[in-house]
Amino acid sequence: MISISDTAQAHFRKLLKKQPDGTNIRVFVVNPGTQNAECGVSYCPPDAVDPEDQHLPFSGFDCLVDPLSAPYLVDATIDFVTDQMGSQLTLKAPNAKMRKVADDAPLIDRIEYVLMSEVNPMLAGHGGKVTLVELTEDKLAILQFGGGCNGCSMVDYTLKEGIEKQLLEKFPGELNGVKDATEHQRGDHSYY
């Protein structure tokens, strides 16, 4: 469920040595399954352990996860990175805002999942987003851009070279392409 790098494990062990015996870490998601989802890591003293918590054993400590957060932390990774700017702990949880869908889920659900978990986080850097409007009988995903993508001069490139390539690679034989249904209006909100 959660992968913790060796450097992050060493960092946690160092921090936990300064805590009372039996203290572990807790990884959680606040507002899971929403666009406002936020992940966190905290100390978890023995008296804060719930019987329903999942215990993920690591070297020298356990990682506890509450049942509500668990499905949103599938494929989460925690790393501790040191560079010229210093050190930082990173937690990446690609499913925090939306539960991972099964490989055999309907195509429309799998496309929506990829848009929300992979495409929109990249577009968000420009204040943009994309949503799936419909999936046609001829296997075309009809998309609508919003935010900074609406009216952006790079939207055609983003659609064909970015999103379409990514979706066709993920769903070969199931999807024939993507089309933009957005009525683009250039304005101050447009990224380019």
From Swiss-Prot:
Gene3D superfamilies: Fe-S cluster assembly (FSCA), HesB-like domain. The keyword Transmembrane helix does not apply. This is Fe/S biogenesis protein NfuA. The keyword Flavoprotein does not apply. InterPro entries: Fe/S_biogenesis_protein_NfuA, FeS_biogenesis, FSCA_dom_sf, HesB-like_dom_sf, NIF_FeS_clus_asmbl_NifU_C. [4Fe-4S] cluster binds at residues 149, 152. Belongs to the NfuA family. GO terms for biological process: iron-sulfur cluster assembly; protein maturation. Involved in iron-sulfur cluster biogenesis. Binds a 4Fe-4S cluster, can transfer this cluster to apoproteins, and thereby intervenes in the maturation of Fe/S proteins. Could also act as a scaffold/chaperone for damaged Fe/S proteins. Homodimer. Keywords: 4Fe-4S, Iron, Iron-sulfur, Metal-binding. One of its GO terms (molecular function) is iron ion binding. Its cofactor is [4Fe-4S] cluster. It comes from the Bacteria. The gene is nfuA.
